[in-house]
């Protein structure tokens, strides 16, 4: 009954996520104007809710609710997407050359759909030439200084206009004055051109002298060897271009002085790199755009050739009596709404209905299948055995085509090389960044703008490679969506002792599932990893709330996961339950991509522990038994 009571309560965060999901679906369906409206409506709703909460807490003298930070983050994401959609509306609108197919329910995605070159087939991504045009639009809008000859041409046009006006005012009888004006005009125009040509030659000579001088400085900075690779030659040319840029601008000198005065200030590093990449005429910012276009052009054909849709869109043959998984046309990863089931679920609720981890006599269709599950006390102790079985099954049932794997490896290598080039060039330009802490912060600041336009396409390729695993995970999510927490292996001591008091949250660890759902809104590996860390911290906080430990001592700041009250044997079943409730099979591909692109230094600390725990939970959920469910 308590679960039923919880069904009627819809949290504002859930409603806000539903609004954002609807806007993303419109954006995916090539309806940018409607999507822009829905993004603004989502922001307005979140602002209204937070304003009401502030007024309520002001009257009651309470603290800020815990969902406020999530609401603000969701509003920030909606605002960024609204800005992106508004920019697209102001640029070239692509017109379809063929009529669209019959409408099919589309999962949410990051980019609007346009027509690709492959026979009118729908593609969720912009063609490379359009992507390159959008990336270069900002740099083309930069102010360009006029050359001396161009300035002289403008001056001569003004002189000619003044001459024609004076000639129109003279009488036909004033022939001598007309001749004088004509000769004067010709003399002035010729003088302007001669002076401009001399200035241009002098300027070109000085520019060439400066270029040679800066090239020599760049050569001295690098090791002097006769045979240079193309990459080394380009690196020298870029460094010389940076030196030339610094000759014409003063701000790099000021920033270098700031770094010298405050060598350990990481906020200064963040501000510097953000400012640097925001200037479209800086050589490093220009290199970033060129590398983005190169990676995008390499990814686009590989993703376009992956014609088969991704899970929950490429279902395996279902067992008799079981339901087929919902097909989809998109390779995107954005908050795919689950298929309506025979058991009604409220539209405003999270991906699964609130459940009561209560008595054994639950009417859930999984109530009689607990015996078919692994023993909840020992299931996670044998996790290595399950993971080994998963690897063997993966090798046996669906080896990916070699070309697709090779395309992924090539793309990953190109991305690593691109990021390394950007980082090394930035460290060359600003020597004050060449410390361990500053280098890590600089890398994080470079990765965010670099990955933002590329991540949806990159993830689509990962999803096509991991389609079989995502299908298995999607099927487990479908079969176990109503499973009580105890059936997944969560001990009762780590569940709410007074479920009626927790009715508003819907189900145990609901906050962790909501936080994990925010991961797909990010487009930077570092921010995605931070979302995973927050998810596990929320799990630990919820577990301590459900089962407080008297010996726990307060400590400043958020405790590391390893120091939490629950151990790995308790954390993994809880995390598996959270994964089931997230309804996001694309987490398999997200984690595979994060493991590849996260810096090694993070993988040996708390972040690496959290990522490994999530991967273990995903592998376990994939292998949940199928027997006894098709009744």
UniProtKB/Swiss-Prot annotation:
InterPro entries: VPS9, Vps9-like, VPS9_dom_sf
Reported tissue expression: Ubiquitous.
Coiled-coil blocks: 187-221
Disulfide bond recorded as keyword: no
Chain segments carrying region Disordered: 318-379
Ranges of Pro residues composition bias in the record: 337-362
BP term (GO), one: vesicle-mediated transport
GO molecular function per UniProt: GTPase activator activity; guanyl-nucleotide exchange factor activity; identical protein binding; small GTPase binding
Keyword Chaperone: no
GO CC, one annotated term: cytosol
PROSITE patterns attached to this UniProt entry: VPS9
Keyword annotations: Coiled coil, GTPase activation, Phosphoprotein
Domain VPS9: residue ranges: 467-630
SMART domains cross-referenced by the UniProt entry: VPS9
In-chain residues carrying the UniProt-annotated modification Phosphoserine: 116
PANTHER family: RAB GDP/GTP EXCHANGE FACTOR, VPS9 DOMAIN-CONTAINING PROTEIN 1
Record-given protein name: VPS9 domain-containing protein 1
């Amino acid at each position: 009954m308590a679960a039923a009571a919880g069904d009627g309560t819809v949290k504002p965060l859930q409603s806000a996520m539903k609004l954002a999901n609807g806007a993303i679906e419109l954006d995916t369906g090539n309806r940018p104007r409607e999507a822009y409206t829905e993004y603004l409506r989502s922001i307005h709703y979140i602002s209204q809710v937070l304003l009401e909460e502030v007024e309520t807490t002001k009257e009651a003298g309470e603290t800020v609710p815990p969902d406020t930070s999530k609401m603000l983050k969701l509003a920030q994401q909606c605002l960024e997407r609204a800005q992106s959609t508004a920019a697209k509306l102001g640029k070239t609108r692509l017109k379809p050359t063929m009529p669209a197919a019959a409408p099919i329910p589309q999962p949410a995605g990051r980019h609007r759909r346009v027509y690709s070159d492959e026979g009118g087939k729908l593609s969720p991504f912009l063609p490379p030439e359009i992507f390159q045009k959008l990336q270069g639009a900002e740099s083309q809008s930069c102010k360009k200084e006029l050359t001396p000859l161009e300035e002289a041409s403008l001056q001569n046009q003004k002189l000619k206009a003044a001459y024609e006006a004076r000639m129109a005012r003279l009488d036909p009888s004033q022939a001598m004055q007309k001749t004088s004006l004509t000769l004067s005009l010709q003399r002035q125009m010729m003088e302007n051109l001669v002076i401009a040509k001399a200035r241009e030659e002098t300027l070109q000579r000085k520019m060439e002298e400066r270029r040679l001088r800066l090239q020599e400085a760049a050569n001295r900075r690098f090791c002097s060897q006769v045979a240079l690779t193309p990459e080394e030659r380009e690196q020298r040319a870029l460094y010389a271009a940076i030196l030339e840029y610094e000759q014409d601008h003063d701000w790099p000198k000021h920033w270098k002085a700031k770094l010298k005065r405050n060598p350990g200030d990481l906020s200064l590093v963040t501000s510097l790199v953000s400012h640097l990449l925001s200037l479209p005429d800086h050589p490093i910012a220009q290199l970033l755009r060129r590398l983005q276009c190169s990676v995008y052009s390499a990814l686009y054909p590989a993703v376009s050739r992956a014609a088969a849709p991704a899970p929950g869109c490429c279902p395996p043959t279902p067992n008799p009596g079981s339901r087929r998984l919902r097909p989809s046309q998109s390779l995107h990863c954005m908050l795919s709404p689950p298929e309506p089931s025979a058991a009604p679920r409220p539209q405003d609720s999270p991906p699964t209905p609130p459940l009561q981890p209560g008595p054994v006599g639950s009417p859930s269709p999984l109530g009689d299948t607990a015996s078919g599950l692994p023993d909840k006390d020992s299931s996670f102790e044998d996790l290595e055995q399950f993971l080994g079985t998963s690897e063997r099954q993966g090798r046996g049932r669906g080896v990916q085509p070699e070309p697709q794997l090779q395309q992924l490896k090539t793309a990953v290598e190109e991305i690593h090389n691109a990021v390394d080039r950007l980082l090394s060039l930035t460290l060359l330009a600003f020597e004050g960044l060449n410390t361990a802490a500053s280098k890590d912060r600089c890398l994080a600041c470079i990765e965010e703008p670099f990955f933002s336009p590329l991540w949806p396409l990159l993830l689509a390729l990962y999803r096509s490679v991991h389609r079989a695993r995502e299908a298995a995970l999607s099927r487990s999510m479908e079969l176990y969506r109503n499973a009580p927490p105890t059936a997944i292996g969560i001990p009762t001591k780590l569940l709410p002792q007074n479920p009626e008091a927790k009715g508003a949250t819907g189900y145990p660890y609901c906050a962790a599932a909501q936080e994990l759902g925010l991961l797909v809104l990010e487009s930077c590996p570092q921010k995605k990893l931070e979302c995973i860390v927050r998810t596990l911290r929320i799990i630990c906080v919820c577990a301590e709330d459900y089962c407080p430990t008297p010996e726990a001592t307060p400590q400043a700041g958020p405790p590391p996961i390893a120091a939490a009250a629950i151990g790995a044997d308790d954390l993994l079943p809880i995390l598996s339950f959270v994964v089931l409730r997230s309804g996001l099979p694309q987490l398999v591909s997200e984690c595979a991509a994060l493991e590849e692109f996260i810096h090694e230094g993070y993988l040996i600390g708390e972040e690496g522990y959290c990522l490994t725990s999530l991967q273990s939970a995903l592998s376990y959920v994939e292998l949940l038994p199928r027997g006894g469910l098709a009744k």
